[in-house]
Structure formats: structure tokens, C-alpha cells
């Protein structure tokens, strides 16, 4: 969108304020820079937290039982050769993108593997990729295998008998119509690619399953969907399930076959049973969606389950995997990790993994007790069919922003996506006296919020979360108190239906001129002078509040309104460090405002021609 540069503009304005106060004559015409020699002695070190972030891609080796891979959505590709006891990142400094969308190891030669970049679980913080990468030495070195314009991928599937033949599911650009999407095939190990399945410029490929008994039989799904800052849409005429019996040269659509649900169709996950090639499972997003099963290779279908447990938040999940040894066993990945042993009719087994929100599963084709699963905490391994799992301890956490506490030595604090807030020591652990004896501590709030440390009491933190949640946490006592601006829960509502529009990660900042004053922002700027006991609104609506950006999110099948879609908000807030009563505010829909009288009046100072 043309106004997305507004945050950078506000930060630039706030940074320039001290210069104006020190030198009233002129402002510099060139941006500031720092001599690299001043930074040459600085070295980075990992201070934690020692807990993983989201993963949506896993794979393993059939012939090497202790070798597995998982891809982080922001931390690259990781490998273990000791069954998950230890992990090593394989891509740092070797590839130019750390957002792993899919990964596969060649069954015929486990030294050969491919991974795709860019994610397709269309969250508000979805990240683009930079093509496909290939390794011939178990991940020690990498070469680009092209398709950089596709941007976002999900699956990569390799012919189990031919490491040079592979397919990738290219979803494409998630925010704009593009022709760079569909199923791509390479017959020469990624040197060249052909687009073999394509519907239109709004529908990308999202899943692929190859029949291990007959690798020329392939199933693939296309998904019409988009994500923009103010919402997302899943479903449309471009979505569909397809089958090829000649290695991807020709395709027939299965979505219209008897037993399939009527449109509109959304996201589809598919898996063919390695036990019986005629048995295929499809998880279909539709009004009458659910689990659909065929025993004739897709000619006819029957719905075996319409449970919401297997199809909630379809855009974020809709993954499944057939068991390689048991025909009637199928796993579904959703909020819970579910298993059916009756051909997809019921899912009574909830497999306990270290973290919730499940996205991918690889099962060893020669041992159905050995598997690796991907969830919002990373990759985790089981060698007993899911009875127990390895820990998810590696530095792949996605942190929204950092806050330095006023302790000495100080703590480094942040909110971790898909987890909680977390503070870790900057120096060592000797001075840490954490309640409960943990390695770090949460300061309340949630996964997406700002954290503000009280400038007068280093033990007091204010931490936010989506939906306008705001907590006050006292480190010395361990007590948490809700100090929300409004006692409201907007989950499930459109932005147009809620009184205050708090962004997924809304600003919470102290006034550097008045240490008793704390600010927060929705479409309005709010302040408290009594530690959140009461709040006062000090601005009008400082956004464009365009109705086109405030409507329902999710599309015509499954609404999804969890707070990340809340738009037209004050996204950046910067009280001046030098001038009392001066506050700058930037909205996510492209406006800059300033007050010089503590909020009594505001001026729109949006630069003309802002890109």
C-alpha cells in the first residue's frame, strides 16, 4: 500500500528532533551515518531466549534414523544428526533468506535436499521468500535453484526414486495478482523449471502429494486467497484439487467430482495413502467442508467428518498426513495435533506436543513410529508414534521489538510471536533472582505487545497484547494487574464494529519529559497519570478511517478476526525527548500528526507526495 512507509517517516522525524533543539539555524540535508570503524570492535552474542519460534516445514531421512530438518519462519533451516538432542542451523551466511516454507530430503539419496522460502500461512506478519535452494551435501553448502519471483512457497516434493525430479507449490505474491504462481516441475534437479499447473493470477498452489507406489500420480491443490494489512480472504473460484497420472504433464480437476462440497472452496490439504494408492484424504475448507475420503483415486468422495477441530482457522492450518503403514490412520494438524484410526471419521486422539498450533508432519516411510512435527514452537521429534517428543530449544524466536530495562545489569525484554513476553539477562545469570527459578521471566502482556519499563521503578513493567490488552507487572512481587484502556474484548468483531481500534502490536510508551505519564494508542492517543487506574483520551481520530479497510476479514467461508486485521490505527507514537508536550503520531494508513500542547490540538503534517 502507498502509505506503508509512514512508520519510517515517524521514526525519522523523532530522530531529527534533538538536532533542531540543539541547532535552530539549519537542519542537515543528508541522512546521518556512523563510521564503521566505531563499530568494528563490537561482537554479537546470543542472549536468548532459548525457545523456538514458528515452523511450518519439516522433513527427515528414511535411511538415517537420527537425521531430521525443520525450517523456521524467521530463523533458517536447522538440522539434527542425533535425533533432536542437539540442532545446528545450516543456512546462516549461506543463503539470503531465512523464511522456510517447505523442505524435503530425497529418499533415494539423503545427501540431496531442497527447501523453499516464503511462508503461505497468511498471518498479518507473513514474510516473502527468495526462491528455492538445493544442497548436495546434507546442507553443508547451498546453491540457488531459481524461482525467485514466486516469492512465497509451501510444499516441495521429490520423486522418491529420482532426486532430479521435483515439484514445488508456488503460492506467489500474497497481496497482489501475479502470474508467478502454481505448481512448478523440474526434471534436472532445479536447473530449469516448468509451470505445469496454473489456474489464474489470483490462485496459488498450496499442497502437493506424490503417490510413493507410482510417482507419476500426483495430487495438488490451488488456493485463491490474499492478505493485506487490513484483512485477508480465503476462497473463490480459483481454488481446487487436481490430479495428474503422467508426472504432472496433464491434470484433471477433482473438486467437482461426486461427493465434493459445493463452492465456494477455500484452502485444501491432500495426502495419498502409501498403503493403498486409491485411498486419498482431502481436508477441504468450505461451508460444508471437512474431511473427504476417496477409495477410487478421486473419482468419487465421501465426507467422513465435519468437525470444527480439524478445520478451524483454515487459512492458518489445513495440513494432514496419511500414515505410511496403516491405511485408516491419518493425522491432522490444527490448533491440536489429531489422529484418526478409522479412516478420518473420528479424531479422538489429541497428541501432546511441546507447543500448540501445528503445521507440518513428516513420518519415516519405513517406520511409522518415527516422525518430526512442526508447530509454533519449532520442530520436535518422536520415535514412539507421538507418545513423547524432544524439546524445542533453539534461538529461532520471532521478537517484535526490544526493550532494555532500567536494572543494572539490565534485562533485555521483548514479546515473542506465538509465545509470551520474555525478559533475559544481558550479562549472565548470576544476578538473576527469577520467581520460580526459571531462566527468564515474562512481564505479562502477550505475544505481540510493546513493553514499557517504568522509569521510576525498574521492577514495574507495562506490557500489551492484541485486542487492546494491557497489564502492569511487578517483578519484585510477581503480581500482575490488568490496566486496559477499555474493559473490552474485540475478538471476532470487524474493525468497524468496535469502539477503539487497537492494532495487533499497538504503542505503549512513557513520556521522557514526565515520568508519571504513560501513553497508549488505538485510533486515538490515550494517557494515564496513575499507573493505569484511569485513562484519558487526548486526541481525535488520527487515521483515515476508510470504511473499505474496516470491514470483515476472512472471506466468504471462514471469518478470521483475531485482532491482527484491525486497521486504521495509530501505529507509531513518539513523545519528544527535548520538548515538553510534543508528541508525534503516525497511522498505519498513512498520516502523520503532531501536538505541541499535550494533546489539546493536533496538526496533520503528513508530507505531500508520500510514497
Predicted features by range, described:
Residues 5-15:
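Bacterial N-terminal signal peptides
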Residues 17-21:
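Sec/Tat signal peptide C-region and signal peptidase I cleavage site
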Residues 22-611:
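Beta-propeller blade termini and top-face loops
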Amino acid at each position: 500500500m502507498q502509505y506503508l512507509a509512514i512508520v519510517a517517516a515517524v521514526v525519522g522525524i523523532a530522530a531529527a528532533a534533538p538536532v533542531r533543539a540543539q541547532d535552530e539555524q539549519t537542519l542537515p540535508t543528508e541522512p546521518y551515518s556512523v563510521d564503521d570503524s566505531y563499530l568494528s570492535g563490537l561482537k554479537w552474542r546470543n542472549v536468548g531466549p532459548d525457545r523456538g519460534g514458528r515452523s511450518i516445514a519439516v522433513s527427515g531421512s528414511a535411511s538415517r534414523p537420527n537425521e531430521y530438518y525443520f525450517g523456521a519462519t524467521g530463523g533458517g533451516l536447522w538440522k539434527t544428526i542425533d535425533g533432536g538432542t542437539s540442532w545446528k542451523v545450516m543456512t546462516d551466511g549461506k543463503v539470503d533468506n531465512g523464511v522456510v516454507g517447505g523442505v524435503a530430503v530425497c529418499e533415494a539419496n539423503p545427501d540431496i535436499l531442497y527447501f523453499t522460502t516464503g511462508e503461505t500461512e497468511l498471518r498479518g506478519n507473513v514474510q516473502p521468500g527468495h526462491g528455492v535452494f538445493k544442497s548436495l551435501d546434507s546442507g553443508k553448502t547451498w546453491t540457488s535453484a531459481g524461482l525467485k519471483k514466486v516469492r512465497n512457497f509451501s510444499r516441495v516434493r521429490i520423486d522418491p526414486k529420482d532426486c532430479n525430479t521435483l515439484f514445488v507449490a508456488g503460492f506467489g505474491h500474497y497481496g497482489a495478482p501475479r502470474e508467478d504462481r502454481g505448481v512448478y516441475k523440474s526434471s534436472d534437479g532445479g536447473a530449469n523449471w516448468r509451470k505445469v499447473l496454473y489456474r489464474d493470477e489470483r490462485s496459488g498452489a498450496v499442497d502437493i502429494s506424490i503417490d510413493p507406489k507410482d510417482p507419476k500420480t500426483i495430487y495438488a491443490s490451488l488456493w485463491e486467497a490474499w492478505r493485506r494489512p487490513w484483512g485477508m480472504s480465503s476462497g473463490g473460484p480459483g481454488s481446487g484439487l487436481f490430479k495428474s497420472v503422467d508426472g504432472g504433464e496433464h491434470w484433471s480437476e477433482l473438486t467437482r467430482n461426486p461427493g465434493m462440497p459445493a463452492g465456494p472452496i477455500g484452502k485444501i490439504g491432500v495426502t495419498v495413502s502409501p498403503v493403498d494408492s486409491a485411498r486419498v484424504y482431502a481436508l477441504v475448507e468450505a461451508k460444508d467442508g471437512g474431511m473427504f475420503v476417496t477409495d477410487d483415486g478421486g473419482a468419487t468422495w465421501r465426507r467422513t467428518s465435519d468437525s470444527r477441530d480439524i478445520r478451524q482457522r483454515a487459512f492458518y492450518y489445513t495440513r494432514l498426513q496419511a500414515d505410511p503403514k496403516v491405511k485408516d490412520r491419518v493425522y491432522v494438524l490444527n490448533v491440536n495435533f489429531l489422529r484418526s484410526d478409522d479412516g478420518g471419521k473420528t479424531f479422538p486422539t489429541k497428541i501432546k506436543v511441546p507447543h500448540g498450533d501445528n503445521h507440518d508432519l513428516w513420518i519415516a516411510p519405513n517406520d511409522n513410529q518415527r516422525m518430526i512435527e512442526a508447530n509454533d514452537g519449532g520442530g520436535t521429534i518422536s520415535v514412539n508414534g507421538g507418545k513423547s517428543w524432544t524439546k524445542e530449544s533453539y534461538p529461532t524466536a520471532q521478537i517484535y521489538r526490544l526493550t532494555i530495562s532500567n536494572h543494572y545489569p539490565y534485562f533485555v525484554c521483548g514479546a515473542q510471536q506465538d509465545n509470551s513476553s520474555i525478559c533475559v539477562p544481558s550479562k549472565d545469570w548470576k544476578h538473576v533472582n527469577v520467581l520460580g527459578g526459571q531462566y527468564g521471566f515474562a512481564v505479562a502482556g502477550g505475544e505481540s505487545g510493546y513493553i514499557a519499563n517504568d522509569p521510576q521503578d525498574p521492577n514495574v513493567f507495562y506490557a500489551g497484547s492484541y485486542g487492546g490488552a494491557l497489564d502492569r507487572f511487578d517483578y519484585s512481587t510477581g503480581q500482575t494487574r490488568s490496566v486496559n484502556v477499555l474493559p473490552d474484548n474485540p475478538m471476532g468483531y470487524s474493525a468497524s464494529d468496535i469502539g477503539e481500534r487497537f492494532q495487533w502490536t499497538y504503542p505503549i510508551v512513557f513520556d521522557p519529559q514526565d515520568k508519571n505519564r504513560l501513553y497508549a494508542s488505538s485510533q486515538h492517543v490515550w494517557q494515564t497519570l496513575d499507573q493505569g487506574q484511569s485513562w484519558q483520551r487526548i486526541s481525535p481520530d488520527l487515521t483515515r478511517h476508510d470504511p473499505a479497510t474496516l470491514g470483515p476479514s476472512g472471506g466468504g467461508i471462514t471469518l478470521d478476526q483475531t485482532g491482527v486485521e484491525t486497521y486504521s490505527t495509530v501505529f507509531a507514537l513518539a513523545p519528544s525527548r527535548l520538548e515538553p508536550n510534543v508528541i508525534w503520531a503516525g497511522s498505519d494508513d498513512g498520516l502523520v500528526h503532531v501536538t505541541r500542547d499535550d494533546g489539546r490540538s493536533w496538526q496533520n503534517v503528513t508530507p505531500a507526495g508520500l510514497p
